[in-house]
């Protein structure tokens, strides 16, 4: 089974919810595969977004590129709908002045149909997420 970036919109994933949206920096930018685009929060925390894979996947490694994110929680769900999320990963990120935070996480028990990313706190009034990539495999399609 080949490993792919499961989060890319070109692989069928989509951001189905985001707590803030700026028309110049919409949440879809997180998964568009373009390193020049990003999603920005609009102040106040926590902020969150949910990625839907539209299939059952097994994630082995996550890479999150962001700016000013301080504490990040990641929850996962294996339901057909975006419900029943369980706490999966919580990380305190290091502030990197003038450059992107590049957080790589080796994932354990990475079965999911949805991921919810919660930016609990930030180093500034605003934070941005430039990309989320999830290396792994497709387990099965969601049955209707």
UniProtKB/Swiss-Prot annotation:
Residues engaged in binding Ca(2+): 29, 32, 37
User: Which keywords does this chain's UniProt record carry?
Assistant: Calcium, Cell projection, Cilium, Differentiation, Metal-binding, Protein transport, Spermatogenesis, Stress response, Transport
The Gene Ontology terms for molecular function here are: metal ion binding
What's a Pfam family in this record? F5_F8_type_C
Q: Which InterPro entries would you find in this protein's record?
A: FA58C, Galactose-bd-like_sf, IFT25
GO terms for biological process, alphabetical: cell differentiation; cilium assembly; heart development; intraciliary anterograde transport; kidney development; left/right axis specification; lung development; protein transport
Where does the protein end up?
Cell projection, Cilium
According to the UniProt record, one GO cellular component term is: cilium
User: According to its UniProt record, in which tissues is this protein expressed?
Assistant: Detected in placenta.
**Stated role:** Component of the IFT complex B required for sonic hedgehog/SHH signaling. May mediate transport of SHH components: required for the export of SMO and PTCH1 receptors out of the cilium and the accumulation of GLI2 at the ciliary tip in response to activation of the SHH pathway, suggesting it is involved in the dynamic transport of SHH signaling molecules within the cilium. Not required for ciliary assembly. Its role in intraflagellar transport is mainly seen in tissues rich in ciliated cells such as kidney and testis. Essential for male fertility, spermiogenesis and sperm flagella formation.
Q: Which family does it belong to?
A: Belongs to the IFT25 family.
Subunit: Component of the IFT complex B, at least composed of IFT20, IFT22, IFT25, IFT27, IFT46, IFT52, TRAF3IP1/IFT54, IFT57, IFT74, IFT80, IFT81, and IFT88. Interacts with IFT27. Interacts with IFT88.
Q: What is this protein called?
A: Intraflagellar transport protein 25 homolog
Gene name in the database record: IFT25
């Amino acid at each position: 089974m080949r490993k792919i970036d499961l989060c890319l919109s070109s692989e069928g994933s989509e951001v189905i919810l985001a707590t803030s949206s700026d028309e110049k920096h919409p949440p879809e930018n997180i998964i568009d595969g373009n390193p020049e685009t990003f999603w920005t929060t609009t102040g106040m925390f926590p902020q969150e977004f949910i990625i839907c894979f539209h299939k059952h996947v097994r994630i082995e490694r996550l890479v999150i590129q962001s700016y000013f994110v301080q504490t990040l929680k990641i929850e996962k769900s294996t339901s057909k709908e975006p419900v029943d999320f369980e706490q999966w990963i919580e990380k305190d990120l290091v502030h990197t002045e003038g450059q992107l935070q590049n957080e790589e996480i080796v994932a354990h028990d990475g079965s999911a149909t949805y991921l919810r990313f919660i930016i609990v706190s930030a180093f500034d009034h605003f934070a941005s997420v430039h990309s989320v990539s999830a290396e792994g495999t497709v387990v099965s399609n969601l049955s209707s």
